[in-house]
Regions:
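A conserved alpha-helical element in kinase catalytic cores
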Residues: 4-48, 167, 241
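Intrinsic disorder
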Residues: 6-13, 62, 162-170, 184
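A domain-level signal for the structural core that forms small-molecule/cofactor-binding pockets
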Residues: 9, 19, 23, 125, ...
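Conserved structural core of kinase catalytic domains
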Residues: 32-165, 201-210, 217-218, 227-228, ...
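Short glycine-rich, low-complexity/disordered patches
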Residues: 32-35, 183-195, 290-297
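Acidic, metal/cofactor-coordinating or nucleic-acid-engaging core segments within structured domains
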Residues: 158, 162, 187, 249-312
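Catalytic activation segment of kinase domains across protein kinase-like and atypical kinase folds
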Residues: 162, 181-270
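Short, hydrophobic/amphipathic alpha-helical packing segments
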Residues: 168-180
Length: 315
């Protein structure tokens, strides 16, 4: 359940409309998953809230909210691997026991690299009691700061783990094609996360279980997982013209660095951008069958705007 927080520019009823728009329009793409919507809860619906509030923390009150399918976190083995690999300075089991770190969704940042080096070295065997106490205090601060809830996984980290990101690029390209040319929304500020696939016995969804990204290698590393898309509260409708493409272009650059970027000097990043670009053009063409030629040209314009913006920022 997602409750309305009253933030400026954010509306839970608008998010519900966007969510419904994206999930109810038939789509042939199955490389990604979207949580199924279970309905909208009105703050004035006393009957519904009287049944729900007893199951929530005592400080919760009735409000506008949307109820949707829960995205299951990655397996415990994946959580442990992330901590042991990227935070060797802390006790992985302490992190694993933290209730706030149970629901680990991974954010695949295909458009950014981050070379992290731990600031903490191995403890000296000749530490004084005071040094050991300082080390324990620092460790407790680190434990409070570490969160696996929305764990950012950058390109260099995927390479370190041996993960092939090409399937994620395919899923993101398909998702953008669906949002742009099937649902006609800009995709502004949507989130992409890696989580477990929905139960195979769940036939309530019109989409099948995404399989394109679940290579044997990636599954062996993170366990069974798919790309999920969520948070549509800042999405806006677009028109099928150059103005709409411009709006989608601004949304692309305004989002977190999920998508591959053009113009990188890194060969792996170049290959990933090519995969993303080719898939987006192909999937967009499939979505726009039957549309006039002027509309069929728009996906190519979108890609060109991205390249131009990257070229300008790099010069």
């Amino acid at each position: 359940m997602k409750r309305e927080d009253g933030s400026t520019g954010r509306s839970i009823s608008h998010e519900y409309r966007m969510h419904q728009k994206i999930t109810t329009i038939p789509s042939p793409f199955t490389s990604f998953a979207i949580p199924q919507s279970a309905g909208f809860l009105d703050a004035e619906d006393d009957a519904a809230w009287s049944a729900i509030l007893p199951r929530l923390p005592p400080d919760y009150t009735a409000c506008n909210a949307i109820v949707s399918e829960k995205i299951l976190p990655v397996k415990d083995s994946a959580r442990r691997l992330l901590v042991q690999t990227f935070r060797p300075d802390v006790d992985a089991e302490d992190i694993m026991r933290s209730q706030s770190n149970k629901h680990c969704l991974v954010r695949p940042y295909l458009g950014r690299r981050r070379f992290y080096q731990s600031e903490m070295g191995a403890a000296s065997t000749g530490e004084s009691e005071r040094q050991q106490q300082q080390q324990r205090q620092r460790r407790r601060r680190l434990l409070r700061a570490i969160s696996l809830r929305n764990f950012p996984l950058h390109m260099d980290q995927m390479e370190q783990l041996g993960i092939d990101p090409s399937g994620y690029a395919v899923a993101m390209a398909d998702a953008l094609a669906v949002m742009h040319w099937v649902a006609h929304v800009d995709g502004n500020d949507v989130e992409f996360v890696l989580g477990q696939p929905r139960c195979q016995s769940d036939t309530s969804s019109s989409s099948t279980i995404p399989r394109d990204i679940c290579s044997d290698t990636n599954t062996a590393i993170l366990g069974p997982h798919v790309v999920w898309i969520l948070d549509f509260d800042l999405c806006r409708d677009i028109s099928l013209d150059e103005e709409g493409v411009g709006q989608a272009h601004h949304a692309f650059w305004g989002n977190d660095p999920y998508f591959p970027r053009p113009g990188s000097s890194n060969l792996a990043d170049q290959r990933l951008w090519a995969i993303f670009q080719d898939r987006y053009i192909k999937s967009s063409a499939a979505a726009l069958q039957g549309e006039p030629d002027r509309v069929k040209q728009l996906p190519g314009l979108f890609i060109e705007l991205i390249k131009q913006a990257r070229s300008v920022s790099s010069s």
